[in-house]
Regions:
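Bulky hydrophobic/aromatic packing residues
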Residues: 14, 30, 84-86, 133
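Short cysteine-rich loop/turn motifs with clustered Cys
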Residues: 13-44, 65-67
Length: 133
């Protein structure tokens, strides 16, 4: 059975994708650092930053405990760059989003090496990166 949401349809391999995102986060919430521990009230979930469940790009998926998921749902989104100063964990994901928007390399290693330049580009500040790639 295909899982649906208001924003679209989850891919058929969603459970595998979500399991991988949680594993890459070390079984911990990337926002608050709590380990997955349902007995203590910390169940790890996967959040789509652009609210589109069909978009499973690495920069769009974050492992969050349910508490953080509910806190950021609809508040921390790609189109709100002012969040960057208050939310350091968010920077790499926004940089990946901008790399995709500007048709630049989107692999995690490349994006992480160019985070600040990508954010500058996304916020309308020219960068040598645009010319160099």
């Amino acid at each position: 059975m295909t899982r649906r949401s208001e924003g679209g349809t989850y891919p058929p391999n969603w459970h595998e994708v979500a399991r991988q995102v949680k594993a890459e986060a070390g079984g911990c919430c990337i926002r608050c650092g709590h380990a997955h521990s349902p007995a203590d009230g910390y169940t790890l979930t996967v959040h789509h930053l652009d609210m589109n469940p069909a978009n499973c790009a690495w920069w769009n998926l974050v492992a969050l405990c349910q508490r953080c998921h509910l806190t950021i749902q609809g508040r921390v989104v790609m189109e709100r760059p002012w969040m960057l100063d208050h939310t350091p964990w968010f920077k790499a994901y926004v940089a990946g989003h901008y790399a995709a928007l500007f048709a630049l390399p989107g692999d995690r290693e490349w994006v992480l090496a160019h985070v600040d330049e990508l954010i500058d580009m996304g916020q309308g500040r020219r960068s040598a990166l645009a010319v160099a790639v």
